[in-house]
UniProtKB/Swiss-Prot annotation:
Annotated protein name in UniProt: Phosphate acyltransferase
GO biological process terms, semicolon-separated: fatty acid biosynthetic process; phospholipid biosynthetic process
Lineage, broadest ranks: Bacteria, Pseudomonadati, Pseudomonadota, Betaproteobacteria, Burkholderiales
InterPro entries xref list: FA_synthesis, Phospholipid_synth_PlsX-like
Domain of life, per lineage: Bacteria
GO molecular function, a single term: phosphate:acyl-[acyl carrier protein] acyltransferase activity
Entry's EC annotation: 2.3.1.274
Source organism per UniProt: Bordetella petrii (strain ATCC BAA-461 / DSM 12804 / CCUG 43448)
Assembly behavior: Homodimer. Probably interacts with PlsY.
Catalytic activity: a fatty acyl-[ACP] + phosphate = an acyl phosphate + holo-[ACP]
């Protein structure tokens, strides 16, 4: 039985999204059990609206506090110790759940998850990673997407290690290619942090292909694209906004007159396939990598359909043993990186110089 703890109160909409999504998920995956974490009376009232809810697959975990979307991290972490967000992460720590999911405040979710679960050896900060569809029919793993606004070159190297480990574990790619997001491919481009990170990546055993630009994400030029959380979040929100805009424009154009309506009817199968490929809701659910447990971040604005995919991401992570495999890969790659750095720092033996 796969056990997933849900922060039912988190996100822009809270219970009106999380409870229906949990019910549909439970129906779809009978091998799963859900811990519904939040204000118990509110959860009971939300469940009562769905008479056919599989109640035997749910366990309500009572919380007395809720982390709002605008709560400062310090408040969420230090004062709201009985929040639904905190208790969802604690359920994983205590072994009551195999994974936890929240659509709440990103900064608070990262801080709480990091505090409760701790980071893997060799990792200073967790990073948010997700898959963005590309023209090859596969997907590009991009991280960080907002967990770390300010990063050092060493942090970017660690993100590359985690992204490589994730791609190996989930996409089964033996030697994933890595690119560093920059304003150009040339080595002279970028700020000092990016330049230093590129040098660290070049000296590492990772399959680093150099700097990449934003359009390379959609070309599928590399398997993993690394950037700081500020840039990554802007990229992600831009992609989502563009997808929604294109969907709206296409719909408007096909509804313009009778001829376009007929053309739309003929093109409907193609349009449906296109929508499925680019619908950002189907890619909802980003993994918070680098922790000693499976943590999934849903979009705060996710609807029921999108939140269901975040729950599926959590289930897939458990089934594929993502956390264990990522921990093993991170340990192995980190060791290789450290060995490479040690070798690079050794003085030349006498007689080797010309």
């Amino acid at each position: 039985m796969i056990r997933i703890a849900i922060d039912c109160m988190g996100g822009d909409f809270g219970l009106p999204v999380t409870i229906p999504a949990a019910i549909e998920f439970a129906r779809q995956f009978p091998d799963s059990r859900l811990l519904l974490v939040g204000l118990p009376e509110a959860i009971e009232a939300a469940l009562a609206e769905h008479k056919a809810a599989p109640r035997d697959r749910f366990e309500i975990v009572p919380a007395t506090e809720v982390v709002s979307m605008d709560d400062p991290v310090e408040i969420a972490l230090r004062r709201k110790k009985d929040s639904s967000m905190r208790l969802a992460a604690q359920a994983v720590k205590d072994g009551r759940a195999d994974a936890c999911v929240s659509a709440g405040n990103t900064g608070a979710w990262m801080a709480i998850s990091r505090y409760v679960l701790k980071t893997l050896d060799g990792i200073d900060r967790p990073a948010i990673a997700t898959s963005i569809p590309n023209q090859t029919g596969r997907a590009t793993t991009v991280l960080d997407l907002g967990a770390n606004v300010d990063c050092t070159a060493e942090h970017l190297l660690q993100f590359a290690i985690m992204g490589t480990a994730l791609t190996q574990a989930v996409d089964h790619r033996d030697n994933p290619t890595v690119g560093l997001l920059n304003i150009g491919e040339e080595v002279i481009k970028g700020n000092e942090v990016v330049k230093e990170a590129a040098e660290l990546l070049r000296r590492s055993p990772l399959n680093f292909r150099g700097n990449v630009e934003g359009n390379d994400i959609f070309k599928g030029t590399v398997d993993v694209v690394v950037c700081d959380g500020f840039v990554g979040n802007v990229v992600l929100k831009s992609v989502e906004g563009l997808a929604k805009m294109l969907s709206s424009v296409i719909r408007e154009e096909f509804q313009r007159n009778l001829v376009t309506l007929l053309a739309g009817a003929i093109a409907k199968p193609v349009l449906n396939r296109l929508r499925n490929r680019v619908d950002n809701r189907r890619y909802n659910g980003a993994a918070l990598l680098g922790l000693r447990g499976v943590v999934i971040k849903s979009h705060g604005s996710a609807d029921v359909y999108a939140y269901g995919f975040a729950l599926q991401r959590a289930r897939e992570a458990v089934v594929s043993k993502l956390q264990e495999r990522t921990a093993q890969a991170v340990a192995l790659i980190t060791q290789r990186v450290q060995m490479g750095e040690a070798a690079a720092g050794e003085p030349e033996a006498a007689g080797d110089t010309v």
